[in-house]
């Protein structure tokens, strides 16, 4: 796989494998690569722009009011902080692709940017698991723990998630380097794996620890959450004919589906990449298919960081309440001639789905 270097990982364990002498033998899609070089940077900058604004706004809404965060807000604020750090590194990769993978920023940023990307992969999914687990405890086992205990556990959990995410990104930080590629006349930021066994370790870390195991936990928690909500909805309809918790149900489904849609393609192509490395699949078709697929899947997964403010916050009622509280706190009374009750009605109509 000579023509591309996906931001998260590299495909080869040594430079001779990465850049064979007949590097253009499988260059069967030059038009596709030219299109990617033109389109992807704009796409990445758009993700950075909206992700920066969205996650900054989320953090401001959570942190500006001078009161203690509840459990859900602790997790969501950490998720926004992780995504904010991540999107700050995207302009570097946009410039890298504009230059056709010629890395102009030096060895240190090569390591730091890719380490941040790798850490975000784990931190985000682990936070999704933590959010699902907390909601599972609240809705399925409401008497299992008290609110103060849950808040303390949420803080500890978030610290551990950041530490674990940082530790799992250490190999990327240590093994990333810039290498000259004379055949292509570029200096690339690449990950050189020192031994063939690292390919297996990488797929275990990336696909199993970073996707399949968290996905199993998310499915387990959300299945029981949805079952509990359906039971409550049936009871509610029987007693008062109303629909309750429909917003929560929709939010949970949105979380799971959005995560799968954004990240499943990347892990699929990462697994195909592993099969190519162990020569389970061969040929130019698979090389070009995996190279191009990884590029697209990488940055499609990145959209999750700009969607998180919408998916995890704006879809739910929690954030709407926080925005309203912040609005009342920051709006001078002299600038509010209408009554607070009318203002609240207008605000509720504005946010009504």
Curated annotation (Swiss-Prot):
- Indicate what this protein is called per its UniProt record: B1 bradykinin receptor
Extracellular-side positions: 1-40, 99-111, 179-199, 273-291
Report the subcellular localization.
Cell membrane
Gene (UniProt):
BDKRB1
Which molecular function terms from Gene Ontology are attached? bradykinin receptor activity; peptide binding
Q: Which domain of life is it from?
A: Eukaryota
Which residues form each disulfide bond in the chain? 110-189
Q: Name one Pfam family in it.
A: 7tm_1
One GO term of the cellular component aspect?
Answer: plasma membrane
Asked if Phosphoprotein is a keyword of the record, the answer is no
Q: What is the lineage of its organism?
A: Eukaryota, Metazoa, Chordata, Craniata, Vertebrata
Q: What is its main location?
A: membrane
Cytoplasmic topological domain: 65-73, 134-155, 227-247, 315-353
Sites of S-palmitoyl cysteine lipid linkage?
330
Identify the keywords attached in UniProt to this record, alphabetized: Cell membrane, Disulfide bond, G-protein coupled receptor, Glycoprotein, Lipoprotein, Membrane, Palmitate, Receptor, Transducer, Transmembrane, Transmembrane helix
Transmembrane feature ranges: 41-64, 74-98, 112-133, 156-178, 200-226, 248-272, 292-314
Example GO biological process:
positive regulation of cytosolic calcium ion concentration
Protein family per UniProt: Belongs to the G-protein coupled receptor 1 family. Bradykinin receptor subfamily. BDKRB1 sub-subfamily.
